[in-house]
Amino acid sequence: MLFRILIILSIALIQKTGDNPGKRIIFTEDFEQSFLNLNHWNYELGDGCPNLCGWGNKEYQHYTKENVFVRDEKLVIKATKQGDQYFSGRITTKDKIEFQYGTVEVKAKLPKGLGVWPAIWMLGHDIDENYWPNCGEIDIMEYVGRMPGKIHTTLHTKDSYGISKNTKITTVEEIETGFHIYKMHWNESQIKFSIDDQEIYTFAPTEKTAEIWPFDKPFYLILNLAVGGYFGGFEVDDSILPQEFIIDYIKVYKDINL
């Protein structure tokens, strides 16, 4: 009986997932439930005040639970405006799903229009003690409506703070149309990014000090849709609202020999 259980567990750990055979699954989220799984996710609410008003970027939105929901087995983060106030959503896996190394794969459809700023990103699990940017940040995908057709991938570190490096802007025709797959492969030596299985950027510094490479520890996932701000732009076209950032699935996996 024990042998049988071990075989079943081994098969589960080395299960094939779509185009990723022979991978060891760390985390998967396909939003089959009609509600957000709070065993995996946390809501981040409000405007960041008093400690981080505007979420550190002078963003306009207040985050609410109501602006994050599951519809047709997909996660929807919806940006809206009511009166003079913008609302949207942000969720994280902090303290629930954290991992070191592996591949993150997210299939998502972007919102569009001046002022929207969706992102798929990660922060070091020690951010509460080792403040940003020392904790490290991995931006798997950022898009801003003021720069249509372009995807931003960036690594934020103490070494790169205030300097435009460790970043890539990739032009993708019709990126706002339909779903696309954003992927980040991370190991002890490098971080690679791809869109629809086309590699776009690799960060592989030869020197790996804490200032350059704070990526040797667990990180957690963040999904959000901001409105306005330093990067999103301070001009918002209210006529395009509401807008939705839709996530079909999330997979985190490692090679079976890791």
Short names for language-model regions:
Residues 1-8:
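Sec-dependent signal peptide recognition
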Residues 10-16:
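N-terminal signal peptide
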Residues 17-258:
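GH16 jelly-roll
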